[in-house]
């Protein structure tokens, strides 16, 4: 997914998000300084990959949203392709939550922010739970088990050590896995996980 395949309205919203991200990043650490020059590829298009992984999801929960990846990006795409989709962003840091609320307000997104630790939030029964650069897979699976509906799907964006994390997680968890190779970072993957059970 890139600018050539995205509607003008979505592209405009993504540009607004990009600009807000850089503006706020000067005050609070939303993205690393080393990735500022490559925000589109490293963060926005990378996050956009999860949009195509699930066709229908009325409730999408993004855990540890931070700077809004992938949650805000999902909400931006949903505005045009699935306006009934509600995105819930879970972020415990008050300053980052303030940024997320600003983006939601300025872009009129169907999203809300929960400012709590993930493990303290009441079960959300989501159709999709996502996370990017948040925690080890075993920890993410415990979060997903808590917040997914029975038929829900977890989408975890993982770096080059994803296969090692999967092997380690399989020692204490049972789950169905489909790995999607990342289009922005060949060694990385999006892990599509269902049927999560502790063993």
UniProtKB/Swiss-Prot annotation:
HAMAP family the record matches: 16SrRNA_methyltr_G (MF_00074)
Keyword Transmembrane helix: no
Key words, A-Z: Cytoplasm, Methyltransferase, rRNA processing, S-adenosyl-L-methionine, Transferase
Positions that bind S-adenosyl-L-methionine: 64, 69, 118-119, 132
Physiological role: Specifically methylates the N7 position of guanine in position 527 of 16S rRNA.
Family statement: Belongs to the methyltransferase superfamily. RNA methyltransferase RsmG family.
Primary site of residence: cytoplasm
GO cellular component: cytosol
UniProt source species: Roseobacter denitrificans (strain ATCC 33942 / OCh 114) (Erythrobacter sp. (strain OCh 114))
NCBIfam families registered for this protein in UniProt: rsmG_gidB
Domain of life, source organism: Bacteria
Pfam families registered for this protein in UniProt: GidB (PF02527)
Cell location: Cytoplasm
Protein name, as recorded: Ribosomal RNA small subunit methyltransferase G
Enzyme Commission number(s): 2.1.1.170
Gene Ontology MF terms: rRNA (guanine-N7-)-methyltransferase activity
InterPro entries with a match to the protein in the record: rRNA_ssu_MeTfrase_G, SAM-dependent_MTases_sf
